[in-house]
Amino acid sequence: MPTVDDILEQVGESGWFQKQAFLILCLLSAAFAPICVGIVFLGFTPDHHCQSPGVAELSQRCGWSPAEELNYTVPGLGPAGEAFLGQCRRYEVDWNQSALSCVDPLASLATNRSHLPLGPCQDGWVYDTPGSSIVTEFNLVCADSWKLDLFQSCLNAGFLFGSLGVGYFADRFGRKLCLLGTVLVNAVSGVLMAFSPNYMSMLLFRLLQGLVSKGNWMAGYTLITEFVGSGSRRTVAIMYQMAFTVGLVALTGLAYALPHWRWLQLAVSLPTFLFLLYYWCVPESPRWLLSQKRNTEAIKIMDHIAQKNGKLPPADLKMLSLEEDVTEKLSPSFADLFRTPRLRKRTFILMYLWFTDSVLYQGLILHMGATSGNLYLDFLYSALVEIPGAFIALITIDRVGRIYPMAMSNLLAGAACLVMIFISPDLHWLNIIIMCVGRMGITIAIQMICLVNAELYPTFVRNLGVMVCSSLCDIGGIITPFIVFRLREVWQALPLILFAVLGLLAAGVTLLLPETKGVALPETMKDAENLGRKAKPKENTIYLKVQTSEPSGT
């Protein structure tokens, strides 16, 4: 009986239907980018200092310049690493004293300014920015700076818990229903976040968005990879992820045009309501329908694909089914990912790779945001470098395979982080170049692990397998903001050292996975178990006997 891949070879693996579905679903990938890394602009922290109403009043009376007013409000920045005093402390002075002069009011209070008492910024901060961010609106600086880390960690926590539920939902009730449900919740929560009256409500809507947005992205990814044959799967998988890069570039332009975070949030959220139109544009996955014994519906969709591609349905289409496996369970469960020793080993390796790739990818972005000279240009450069990374992945996957390029890309990312440790912060241009090299390497690794992860699991548990393994990427995303911002306070190079170790180790364990180049998607547990397994010597012997016996009988 023919499989889905057999039928696709006859009706078209990458025909008009697949191209149309690909372009439509790529919009989901592009829309996911502002959610995933939007913190760079939504949570931008500009230069700031304490606000002092007393100094402002005296400045107005004395006609001071802004620089003079700042000089009498906060202590100087001093050596590197002591900027905290200027941003989070101010002079505790009674500015209503009549003895204060306009020339040097602090001189009459102390001969040395270091003897003046310092206090917290009780009256807020003054931010040096023409726009606004969640940092400037909710004062997420100084003692509350960790709340910005929590904002991004909360999103990744939503990714983590949502991945398991959405993945199970997609395998149990279908890819299409999962896609539409997550689109609706994601759009509504994104708009509500733009109208958040306080930090806690904003955090709640961000968590809700995290619970569904990654599942929405993965549902689209799974659909497009299941619509095409094995010959086109590698291309559409990487191009789908390249659409994420297009979303990053578009985000840069939107952030530059809309410097106020609420307008930016609305601009990236409102258009996602249009994805509900996919109800009429995208069919259910025939592979999933077959795994649920809904053969009639799967045959109908395959017939639709044939018509869209201008092909006649093959004569054996009505015999379409999955290969029989008496041990197969149609209802996916977490235990299926660990049922055999081979699957168990692969699952653990994939989990570590997802964790490492997430920490390095988000870590490099946040590190760039914390050390950037021009935030918009630096973000744009680091986003554009993902495009050649995608083409490198396409070329190497076609000619070399998945495993060796993925190992080399992790090695490149880890080595880049190691090199950045020894580059002076004053050489900003060199830091950006090395960071872009590392960003390209980790981008290639992420593109490939998405492809490899989907290729190592059978159909009935594929979506759950991708979701569970990629949940380690969310754990990495939860801790990455704290790694970047909190460890930098201990030692600026400490996050980069950790990134380098993780990347170099990931390069080694990648080599333990089987190659999947040119191999059809496994449809049963037996297919998945046999990936990378060589033929037994006994089978080879029988084959040789058959070949040698034929000539003697003629």
From Swiss-Prot:
Its main location: membrane. It comes from Homo sapiens. A large substrate binding region with partially overlapping binding domains for structurally different substrates is formed by several transmembrane helix domains (TMH) including TMH 2, 4, 10 and 11, and it is alternatingly exposed to the extracellular or intracellular side during substrate transport. Amino acids in TMH 1 confer major functional differences between human and mouse orthologs. Contains one proline-rich sequence (Pro-Glu-Ser-Pro-Arg) that is required for transport activity. Glycans are attached at residue 71. Optimum pH is 8.5 for the transport of MPP. While optimum pH is 6.0 for the transport of the drug quinidine, no transport activity is observed at pH 7.5, possibly due to the protonation of quininide at pH6.0. Changing residue 31 to S: No change in fenoterol uptake. No change in trospium uptake. No change in terbutaline uptake. Electrogenic voltage-dependent transporter that mediates the transport of a variety of organic cations such as endogenous bioactive amines, cationic drugs and xenobiotics. Functions as a pH- and Na(+)-independent, bidirectional transporter. Cation cellular uptake or release is driven by the electrochemical potential (i.e. membrane potential and concentration gradient) and substrate selectivity. Hydrophobicity is a major requirement for recognition in polyvalent substrates and inhibitors. Changing residue 342 to H: No changes in MPP(+) uptake. Residues 1-21, 171-176, 230-235, 284-347, 398-402, 453-464, 514-554 are cytoplasmic. Phosphorylated. This is Solute carrier family 22 member 1. Coiled coil: none annotated. Phosphorylation of the transporter leads to changes in its substrate affinity, resulting in a regulation of the transport activity. In contrast with rat ortholog, ASP uptake is inhibited by protein kinase A (PKA) and C (PKC) activation. ASP uptake is also endogenously activated by calmodulin, the calmodulin-dependent kinase II and LCK tyrosine kinase. Inhibited by cGMP, most likely through a cGMP-binding protein that interacts with OCT1. PROSITE patterns: MFS, SUGAR_TRANSPORT_1. The modification Phosphothreonine is found at residue 541. Changing residue 189 to L: No changes in MPP(+) uptake. It is a multi-pass membrane protein. Belongs to the major facilitator (TC 2.A.1) superfamily. Organic cation transporter (TC 2.A.1.19) family. One of its GO terms (molecular function) is identical protein binding. A motif (Proline-rich sequence) lies at residues 283-287. The chain crosses the membrane at residues 22-42, 150-170, 177-197, 207-229, 236-256, 263-283, 348-368, 377-397, 403-423, 432-452, 465-485, 493-513. It holds the Pfam family Sugar_tr. Changing residue 408 to V: Does not affect transporter activity; no changes in MPP(+) uptake.
